[in-house]
């Protein structure tokens, strides 16, 4: 049986939060309080834009988050003058995460280049892979054993 958007996003959220905790001696992180259904509904009405389902589920877990010393940021949506809504920044070097107002598709832009993602969960997977690479740099090839000892196996 296929998982719901809520289940997929909750799993990704939990994994990212645990991964950030695992790396917390080297990298700061913050997951702020969640938004409410009412805040989400009000934002959608005020902006006449429907947030993609997975993004709504994310905001019901955290309204803003900074991972890996602000390298990965996902924040409350900001409408720009284009056909896109800004929801994050990557690396801190000018790469920004958006979703299309029309299609709801997620993409990043950097120096005029566009990288598309299948879903918001794919964005979170991309971040997760980076955090796992950081764990290997810090703890070595056996980082998963240390992770499992500390947090239990997934």
PLM regions and their residue ranges:
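Short helix/loop capping segments that flank catalytic or ligand/cofactor-binding pockets
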Residues: 95-97, 107-108, 116-118
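A surface-exposed partner-binding patch
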Residues: 1-103, 152-154
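Acidic, proline/glycine-rich low-complexity IDRs
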Residues: 131-154
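Intrinsically disordered, low-complexity regulatory segments enriched in Ser/Thr/Pro
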Residues: 102-112
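Compact, glycine/acidic-enriched structural inserts
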Residues: 111-137
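Short, charged/polar low-complexity linear motifs in solvent-exposed/disordered segments
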Residues: 69-71, 124-126, 134, 142-143
């Amino acid at each position: 049986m296929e998982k719901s958007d809520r289940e997929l996003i909750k799993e990704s959220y939990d994994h990212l939060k645990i991964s950030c905790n695992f790396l917390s001696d080297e990298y700061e992180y913050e997951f702020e309080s969640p938004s409410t259904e009412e805040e989400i509904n009000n934002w959608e009405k005020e902006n006449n834009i429907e947030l993609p389902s997975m993004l709504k589920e994310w905001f019901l877990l955290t309204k803003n988050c900074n991972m890996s010393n602000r390298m990965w940021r996902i924040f409350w949506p900001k409408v720009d003058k284009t056909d896109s809504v800004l929801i994050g920044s990557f690396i801190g070097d000018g790469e920004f995460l958006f979703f299309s107002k029309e299609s709801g598709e997620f993409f990043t832009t950097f120096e005029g280049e566009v990288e598309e993602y299948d879903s918001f969960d794919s964005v979170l997977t991309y971040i997760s892979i980076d955090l796992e690479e950081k764990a290997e740099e810090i703890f070595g090839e056996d980082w998963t054993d240390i992770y499992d000892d500390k947090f239990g196996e997934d």
